[in-house]
Amino acid sequence: MSASIPASTFASTPASSTYIGRFAPSPTGPLHLGSLVAAMASYLDARTHHGTWQVRIEDVDGDRNVPGADRHILGSLQRAGMLWDGDATWQSQRGIVYQSAIDYLGEHVYPCGCSRKDIADAQHRLSPKQAQALVYPGTCRHGLPPGRAARALRLRVPQPRHTIAFVDRWYGLVEQDLSDEAGDFVVKRADGFWAYQLAVVADDGAQGITDIVRGADLLDSTPRQIYLQQLLGLRQPRYLHVPVVLNERGEKLSKQTGAAAFDNGASVEQLLATALLPAARWLGMDVRAASIAEFWRAALPAWDRLMLEHRVPGR
């Protein structure tokens, strides 16, 4: 493809010596211990690399947003001592970036008229592995079936095999056959909202993000994002996925599993005892502190030591 992404939409990728990280929470409620762990890891990695740390509110899914949650999140980060560089950004204000990405992708994107029921009904034609992964069967890949109107936009994944491999700084080599494990995936949803995979890649590219540190629950999404980066001509960031926090039932700690806000007006002492210190321990750091400033002074070298333990060859 000879066309280029407009310079006004996507920033040029900075030199690899310039570290630019980010924390990108969804405003579906206040931050809890699980999201604090992800924020802490990304913040510490940026600061130990003498880089910048940005905050992006991923409010592209309007149906799930909780009014005021974005401001609560920003306030919680400040109370915890995690101050970001520059201005926070909101995905809901960046639709032009996502539309520019769709335009650039051109024929790699096609309209899909399938409902969830249509896809479920077609699962029996797939291999057991694809059916279990809910891989899209390609019903609309070569055109909409008669009488079926377009609902969403999907990205074509090369067939029959297309393996994406990358080295994660925590988990090492990760490989995924997109055609077999993901299939053609949605980039714009039937409800009109931009899909997460497209929005996050477009924003990371436009903001020049060089390093992505986040929870391991997003490890499976990374190959799709790398494929989008390749199609959009964006440099691939370095990735570090940290283990997600689990509750006493072994479930990922989340709002859906009853996770409580870590910042509910607690005192500094309570914030340390119930949030910052437990988050550091979950990541594998032995940090002792009596104040928030003291915590971060101790956490920086502790993170360096932790990363030495998890150093992956070539990273």
What is each model feature region?
Residues 68-174, 181, 292-299, 303-315:
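Active-site neighborhoods of enzyme catalytic cores
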Residues 2-6, 10-127, 216-234, 287-294:
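N-terminal Rossmann-like or analogous alpha/beta NTP/dinucleotide-binding catalytic cores
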Residues 31, 191-193, 265-271:
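Structural motif
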Residues 118-264:
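Active-site cores that bind ATP or allylic diphosphates and position pyrophosphate for catalysis
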Residues 115, 124-125, 220-221, 231-315:
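Catalytic adenosine-cofactor/nucleotide-binding cores of aminoacyl-tRNA synthetases and other
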